[in-house]
């Protein structure tokens, strides 16, 4: 099926899209699928200008950290946690606090008062596999509003829920635009695909697109189109 989608994407009908330098946009078919199918499954509703396609979740994490971290913006993440989040934060300008997690994930009540950024994996914590319950999620959002900080949610491995339905994304509870959401097709398709996405308010996505352009121009248009066709099967 993937081979058939690749052949289709190479056809004359798609040639105009594939021969276009999309540094200022992403494949419209892929963006439409993400907005109309992928995100609603997680309880998230976003416009096309609120989504950026990235080279996997790691690229999205790096872009988020580059845009949000400064010396005067202390960051918090989980301990233990996803090693790439920890390493990306260590390389940033922000002072970083690693908060121990319990069986329910990160406890929002333990956040330092000067927190300005929280990076977490609430739906499937790495490496414990725990899921942050609804009460803690709401407490975290309330703390974010009270302390005026931003949350980056890496929705790692949310599909791998064997004991019941996947918990709604933290972003689905966000009414103030404080949660940046990162997703990837690595688990649902295959790890080598390296197609992810970042969901955030449109002004921040515009800045993220500028940064992405300086880093790698854009993810290959042909790969984006094949992915869109494959997902729509």
Where are these regions (language model features)?
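Conserved core of the PLP fold type I
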Residues: 6, 11-147, 159-160, 165-176, ...
């Amino acid at each position: 099926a993937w081979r058939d989608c690749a052949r289709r994407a190479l056809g004359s009908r798609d040639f105009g899209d594939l021969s276009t330098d999309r540094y200022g946009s992403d494949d419209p078919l892929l963006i439409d699928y993400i907005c109309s199918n992928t995100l609603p499954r997680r309880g998230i509703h976003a416009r096309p200008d609120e989504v950026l396609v990235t080279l996997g979740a790691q690229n999205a994490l790096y872009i988020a950290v580059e845009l949000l971290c400064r010396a005067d913006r202390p960051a918090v993440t989980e301990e233990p946690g996803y090693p790439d989040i920890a390493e990306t934060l260590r390389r940033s300008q922000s002072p970083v606090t690693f908060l121990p997690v319990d069986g329910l994930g990160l406890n929002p009540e333990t956040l330092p008062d000067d927190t300005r950024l929280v990076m977490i994996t609430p739906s499937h914590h790495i490496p414990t596999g725990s899921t942050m319950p609804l009460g803690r999620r709401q407490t975290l959002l309330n703390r974010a509003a009270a302390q005026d900080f931003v949350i980056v949610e890496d929705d790692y491995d949310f599909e791998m829920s064997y004991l019941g339905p996947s918990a709604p994304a933290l972003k689905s509870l966000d009414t103030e635009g404080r949660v940046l959401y990162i997703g990837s097709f690595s688990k649902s398709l295959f790890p080598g695909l390296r197609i992810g996405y970042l969901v955030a308010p449109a002004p921040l996505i515009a800045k993220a697109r500028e940064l992405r352009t300086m880093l790698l121009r854009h993810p290959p248009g042909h790969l984006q189109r094949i992915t869109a066709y494959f997902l729509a099967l």
